[in-house]
Amino acid sequence: MSIYAVIGTQWGDEGKGKIIDFLSSKIDYVVRFNGGNNAGHTIVVNNKKFIFNLLPSGVLQGAKCILGPGVVIDPLILIKELEALKHNNIKTEIFISDKAHIIMPYHIKLDELNEQKKGVYKIGTTKRGIGPCYADKINRTGIRAVDLLDIKIFERKLKINLDEKNEIIEKIYNHKPFNYDDILSKYKKCIAILQYAITNTEEILNQAINSGKIILIEGAQGTMLDIEHGTFPFVTSSNTLITATTGCGIPISKIKEKIGIVKAFSSRVGSGPFVTEILGPIGDKIREKGQEYGSTTNRPRRIGWLDLLTIKKSISLNELNHLALTKLDILNNIEDLKICTAYEFKGKIYDYIPTSCEILENVKPVYKVFKGFKQNIRNISHYEDLPIEAKEYIEFIEREVGVQISILSLGAEREKTIFRNQKWINI
């Protein structure tokens, strides 16, 4: 039995999808434990780009896919992704936790209306209904996948929820209410398609563990978006840390290797503190070259220099024992590269991330400056062949954070990968 976990160390969009896709060729099960279709995974195979928002990235390699209890599921989006796989002749076996909560049309509308009401104080959500769905989960009023298996229960819960949500939509937001029969009709069609996959996924995973199967746990988004430990309130609505994997029925003690994905620079989507943000031509150059646009919303991502405080925090919270560095190839032909090693505020040096967003908005980054490299490194397949400037950048990160960079990704394609630790080739 071997269980591996892949976790984003920044604000998401680190390149987890490519790494997971590569590793999944030897995996029996790939498990997603958090988030919904607010997360996007981009994978390039044979020059064809696949973008998934709900399905785990390992789906293209034939691994059995599990959407765990911590995932919130928009059935319409899931069906669309499954149809895309079928269209491309990709076979997959999917299991949906009967404990997973279901995103409803009123969740999406409330997400949109709430963002509009906040005005300049908006968080920058994807408006996919994620937050309102998790709110119903915490409030213990949400509709779960298991409820879809008994139409009478689903009808009753839909009626109760819709009455409440329509009152909010009409009286607080002065917006047109939803029609019960319209939603019921639409979701009955979804149920007919998806009900075969809804099951007790903890039992499936327990059987897989007991029979020695190889399991890959896939985190969505990143540590700095965690609802508890991220830059609150500019965070997602779920736990993104490895501790959330317990919700899948897998004890953390059983996870053999935990690899954190680090992008060679920083990016984030939406509002919130971003200490190392690069405004101007260099940031624009990195964004365009790296195609840094949200795979879910297509919004341009904000670009910044690599911030080691976020990486150290992620390593500590997730007990990461390996790192994968992605998109180093995007940084060629930049004269000076910077890595943030600390923050400064009113004469005080911070070697950790302050909790207060008000402080974070005003700290100044303390940088270590590196000479850039001009060479196009995308076709390099051995670490020794990298420019010395690129190796200095990599090895400085390793020394500062105390964890080996075991994998280097130098492009979106599977083959553009350098392994510095054979463990990840031989899983």
UniProtKB/Swiss-Prot annotation:
Q: Name one Pfam family in it.
A: Adenylsucc_synt
Q: Where in the cell is it found?
A: Cytoplasm
Which coenzymes or cofactors are required? Mg(2+)
Any note on cofactor binding?
Binds 1 Mg(2+) ion per subunit.
Annotated positions binding Mg(2+): D13, G40
Major enzyme class: ligase
Q: Which Gene3D superfamilies match?
A: Adenylosuccinate Synthetase, subunit A, domain 1, Adenylosuccinate Synthetase, subunit A, domain 2, Adenylosuccinate Synthetase, subunit A, domain 3
Residues that bind IMP = D13, E14, G15, K16, N38, A39, G40, H41, T126, R140, Q221, T236, R299
Quote the HAMAP family the UniProt record gives: Adenylosucc_synth
Q: Please report the name of this protein according to its UniProt entry.
A: Adenylosuccinate synthetase
